Amino acid sequence: MKNRKILDYLTILFGFLGLGAMIYLLLSFTLNLISKNSCDIISSVINCTKVVTSNYSTLFGIDWYYYGIGFFSVIIVLSVIRLFNKKEKQNRLFAQLILALSIFGAGVACYLIYVELFLVHHICILCTTGHIAIFSLLIISILRFTKFKDTI
């Protein structure tokens, strides 16, 4: 039970890390409440503005960070429900959903990393924060089903 709660808290923590990065992008590039250059580092490679304003920054006309906000919000909600829910069958289902979402999210993150490195030729630090959060969620989910399978 203790291991399960620790994994749930870690899932919530990384969910908020990713959500925070996506909201920062929203505030910077859509709502213009934060300077767009605030996450650009004087470098030929690290430049959020070039990544977020590139031709690859949307899917079906929607900026990728909106999908990130939705993704991390769902992960957080499922994890909070798991944390307070006492029904094992439902908790197992929520854990499976989080694992499935994490696998999907990791696949999308791999695609976006490819886009940043090989198509745009720039890296966005905030996007990278989101990618790290997604891969951390995947590792936590895998641990939940392997090492701590008795505490799902």
What are the residue ranges of the model-derived segments?
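Membrane-interfacial helix-loop segments of redox and metal-homeostasis proteins
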Residues: 1-152
